[in-house]
Amino acid sequence: MQKNQIVDLEITDLSYEAMGVAHLDGMTVFVNNALPGEIVSAKLLKVKKNFAFAKIEKIKKESPDRINVKLRQWVQTGLASLAHIKYDKQLEFKRNQVVNLLHKADLDNVKVGQTMPSPEETGYRNKAQVPVREVNGKLDIGFFRKHSHDLVPLTSFFTTDPEIDRVLIKVRDILRKNHVPAYDEIHNKGEVRYLEVRRSKATGEIMVILVCLHKDFPQLKEVTKEISEIKGVTSVVLNHNPKKTNVILGKKDYLLWGEPQITDKIGDVSFKISPQSFFQINSLQTPRLYDLAIQKADLKPDDVVIDAYSGIGTIGLSVAKHVKAVRGMEVIEPAVEDANANAKLNGITNAEYVVGKAEEVMPRWAKEGLKTDVIFVDPPRKGLTPEFIDAAVETNPKKIVYISCNPATMVRDLQLFKEQGYDFDEIDPVDMFPQTPHVEAVAVLERTEK
């Protein structure tokens, strides 16, 4: 097998990145956008010792689970890499990811629930971050082609709230009209690197964030004025990112016009969201995710709960009405200020948040005599540190509720908890990100009586 060779392949499976998997001459071949059951003629793009990557030239036998995608670019860019698969099969694929991870970890006895579908299959995202680059001599927005930094221009982002799409295009046109130079990442020059737009499903408020190389540029005043006149926009912010880096946001935000925050809701709890706040992307699915976690935790009115990695308090403040007290911690100081302000905003008096690392704060609270019944944790994709796991176990809660955006690190962490006397018998997948391979999951660990 060699590069550029055309081969016929029978697709037998999907990889965790949703690439078609085939086998030929003892090698595994990953085929972009191919589905199990399909027979394809494919061109080999990269050939390694034990595996190869290929792209479809022709589908000879099509899967009944394939659907036609209006814009090929949605799949090409990875913006919606499952858009060609029927939604019920996407849910099945996500459940299988969890089943396979448990199987590899010799945990076949753990029950995996059916993936909870999202109320919206498209247009569900309450936030978009899109790169701004020059394409064919003019400023454009879109998404990078998979595994590259080539911008594919787009006018519709499919998974994003259509109101956000409308604002993105209007802002693009304002930047063009005012001859604002797009960022050039090779030479680290130009002005606007990214556009970020956040919209509250609850209030309709829209925040526009210009991520810029410089904190001022000649057209900024006029651009701000024109953006502020777009219907629905309540905030215009400049985020200053002067570094030559792939990191999207810089550390400093400047309010150019309007309100410093927008307000959204999870269930009946309101949250003020700042430009850099972490807030779950799928507004309609988030309350269902939290309700599932609360139900599985079987909380009691006398419970004391720790909300670790608390962000702006979304989980803890959603839990507060079910329990006696919520204590939370987070390393990002502005997020802690927002969490305490959000408690006040909702008249929640039994929740408080502090700045600090969970692995340092939890043992301190335990020494001070705090008896914790339940820990809720929703870590970043890399999962929990061994130090956190040790500190959580030392805190000796009856239960640990683990909400994960990466089942691979979740299964790893659950095994570490298991070794330290906490057991679990079920994982429930939740679809927070339809049209993408990402899967959220919930598990409840219970202390086994030693």
Curated annotation (Swiss-Prot):
**Pfam family example for this protein?**
TRAM
Q: Does the keyword Methyltransferase apply?
A: yes
Q: Name one GO molecular function term.
A: rRNA (uridine-C5-)-methyltransferase activity
Annotated binding of S-adenosyl-L-methionine, by residue: Q280, Y309, E330, D378
Q: Residue ranges of the TRAM domain?
A: 1-58
Which UniProt keywords are listed? Methyltransferase, S-adenosyl-L-methionine, Transferase
EC supergroup of this enzyme: transferase
GO biological process: one example: rRNA base methylation
What residues sit in the active site?
C405
What EC identifiers does the entry list?
2.1.1.-
The record's annotation in InterPro entries points to:
MeTrfase_TrmA_AS (IPR030390), MeTrfase_TrmA_CS (IPR030391), NA-bd_OB-fold (IPR012340), SAM-dependent_MTases_sf (IPR029063), TRAM_dom (IPR002792), U5_MeTrfase_fam (IPR010280)
Q: Which family does it belong to?
A: Belongs to the class I-like SAM-binding methyltransferase superfamily. RNA M5U methyltransferase family.
Q: What is this protein called?
A: Uncharacterized RNA methyltransferase LJ_1698
